[in-house]
C-alpha cells in the first residue's frame, strides 16, 4: 500500500481492475470467474487467513478451477483419448467436417 495513493486522490482507476476481477471493469464487462471470486472474497472477508483457509476452501477451489481449468482440460483429454481409441478400433467414424473433408465454406 503506497503512502500516498494518487489514483484514489484524483479519482483515477488506471490499474486497479487488474488486481481484482471483482473490481469495476473498464467496459462494465464482468470477467469469466467474477462470481466465484466474489463468493470467495465474501466468505474470507474479515475472518483471517487461517480460518479462511479452512472455512472457505470450497469457494477458493471453485475460483481456482475457473481460472486454471485443470479438471476441464483433464476431462477433455480423456474424452479425446477415448474418441481416438474408438476411431482406431473402427467403432466410431467422425463426421466429415471434423476431419477436414467437409464442404468448403464461403
From Swiss-Prot:
Residues 30-74 form the CHCH domain. Residues 78-106 are annotated as: Disordered. A motif (Cx9C motif 2) lies at residues 56-66. Pfam families: Ndufs5. Keywords: Disulfide bond, Electron transport, Membrane, Mitochondrion, Mitochondrion inner membrane, Respiratory chain, Transport. Disulfide bonds join 33-66, 43-56. It is a peripheral membrane protein. One of its GO terms (cellular component) is mitochondrial inner membrane. A motif (Cx9C motif 1) lies at residues 33-43. It is found in: Mitochondrion inner membrane; Mitochondrion intermembrane space. Contains two C-X9-C motifs that are predicted to form a helix-coil-helix structure, permitting the formation of intramolecular disulfide bonds. PANTHER family: NADH DEHYDROGENASE [UBIQUINONE] IRON-SULFUR PROTEIN 5 (PTHR15224:SF1). Accessory subunit of the mitochondrial membrane respiratory chain NADH dehydrogenase (Complex I), that is believed not to be involved in catalysis. Complex I functions in the transfer of electrons from NADH to the respiratory chain. The immediate electron acceptor for the enzyme is believed to be ubiquinone. Mammalian complex I is composed of 45 different subunits. This is a component of the iron-sulfur (IP) fragment of the enzyme. Belongs to the complex I NDUFS5 subunit family. This is NADH dehydrogenase [ubiquinone] iron-sulfur protein 5. The gene is NDUFS5.
